[in-house]
Every structure is written in structure tokens, then in C-alpha cells.
Amino acid sequence: MGFPRMFRLAALLALVLATPIFAQQGNIDFGGLRADPKLPVEVTADSFAVDQATNSATFSGEVRISQGDMVITAGEVTIEYAEDGKGIKQLIASGGVLLKAGNDAAQAQTATYLIDTAQVTLTGDVILTQGSAAISGQTLVVNLSDGTGRIEGRVTTTFLPGGN
């Protein structure tokens, strides 16, 4: 077998074996990570502090926020209110952040949830698991209203060949 033929065979084999990886990275279904803004939000924490000067409030110590079947846990969550004082602008979670909904879970060092766009950005050693599949990177951005998202920053995935 000549070098060009062996090279073509190796390239074809690599492409065939890598196809599930490309499919997984390009078509991640974030459908499980969705929020229904009409459902009540429940927050539990060890402590709560309000800062009128910065128009914010901070929950600290084993913070757990739930809305429907979506749960966010973290060491600390700061809520920044809108400038007009009506409504929440964003939530910033830090300290071992875990976002879970159904069979989907994402963990990271920090997370920012922009309320008006329903976008969550997780940063720092992100790991997303969906069933038996896992994908990691440095940044995960998920739109909770439509379930779309992307992961960036040296993306690595683990999958079972022939499975989803």
C-alpha cells in the first residue's frame, strides 16, 4: 500500500470516527436548560444583605435558587436591580455554580443570568453533562427562552460511539 493511498485511508477513517464528535459539538441540544418566567422563584441561603447604594442584594452560603425544574446552586448570588428600581437586571453567581434542569447539568466557577434576554453565561472550567455525554470548555452561553447555546474555549467532549 503506497503512502498516498494509506494517507487517504487514514484521513477517511479519522473523518468517519470523528463525525459523532462534530455532531455533538455542533448540535448540542440545550432544550432541557429552559426557564419559564411565569413560574415563582424560590431562594434559600444562609444569609441575605441589601445594599441600597449599589441597588443590589446578595445571598450568601449554600445558595439555592429554583424556578420550575431549573435549579441554580452557588456559594454566593448577587442580584442587581434595574436602574429604575423595578425588576431585576441580572443575577451573578460565584463559588461552585451548578445549573441543573432535567437531565442537563452545567457547572462552572461563575455564572451571569441576564433577565431581559434570558441568557446565562457560565465561565471558568465549564462542564456540561447531558445524560451520558459530557462537554467542557471555558465559556458556556445558553439562551433559556429557546434552548440554544454554544460552548467555547478549548472544547473537549466525551461520547459513546453509536449513542446520543
Predicted regions and their residues:
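Mature-chain termini and adjacent capping regions
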Residues: 1-164
